[in-house]
Amino acid sequence: MRFTKMQGIGNDYVYVNCFEEHVENPSELAKQMSRRHYGVGSDGLILICPSDVADFEMKMYNADGSNGGMCGNGARCIGKYVYDRGLTDKTTVSLMTDSGLKILNLNVKDGKVQTVRVDMGMPELFPPKIPVDLPGEVVMGHRLN
């Protein structure tokens, strides 16, 4: 399987172009490839997929195989990947994610992407809507020491 490893401000992911490759079990692949000492080593796996509603779709898996939802730095790397490899000639790219539609603005110089800006939308800061999976009793709306 062909893949690319990229990083954006230290967030490193393994990228698979699903226009060319088929990934049977992305959760398991993420776990195997992300192992730092026995795999490629990464924060997770990002699949670059076709989309019916956007230019591309991002499917992200954390190193433990769980669904990652969305990563801004990962999305920025997708912008560079799809432009530099000729999958698009647009400098404004729409990207469907599990967190909704994101718009990537590519700054191109001499035919290569120099920077990518992602409109991430408004952050969610309401504590009950921010998932945290920890062992023990569920506590909402209380300060923890």
Q: What role is predicted for each listed range?
A:
Residues M1-M70, A75-N145:
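Active-site proximal loop and beta-alpha junction motif in alpha/beta enzyme cores
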